[in-house]
């Protein structure tokens, strides 16, 4: 069984990522990393808070938060800098 799982947060509703996170913890994963870029950052934060406070209260804690910036190719081949975040959730 894997001890860590990464979930990439994107365009789907936040509840999809909440369900994926809860299912990972129920399957025995000890650590889940939520990764998001740009506009999806707020969705990743909402996912982490919903899992911690509503779905698994007292069982999951936010272990670490990393704020990053990624270089991506924009339109016309120009390089852009996009904000990114990694939120680490662990079983308490």
From Swiss-Prot:
Under the heading InterPro entries, the entry gives: Alba-like_dom_sf, DNA/RNA-bd_Alba, DNA/RNA-bd_Alba-like
Q: What is the predominant subcellular site recorded for this chain?
A: cytoplasm
Report whether Coiled coil shows up as a keyword of the record: no
Residue ranges annotated as transmembrane are none
Pfam families the record matches: Alba
Keyword Acetylation listed? The answer is: yes
The Gene Ontology biological process annotation of the record reads:
chromosome condensation
Domain of life assignment:
Archaea
Q: Which residues carry this modification: N6-acetyllysine?
A: 11
Q: Where is the signal peptide?
A: none
Q: Where in the cell is it found?
A: Cytoplasm; Chromosome
HAMAP family, alphabetized? AlbA (MF_01122)
The protein here is known as DNA/RNA-binding protein Alba
- Organism in which the protein naturally occurs: Pyrobaculum neutrophilum (strain DSM 2338 / JCM 9278 / NBRC 100436 / V24Sta)
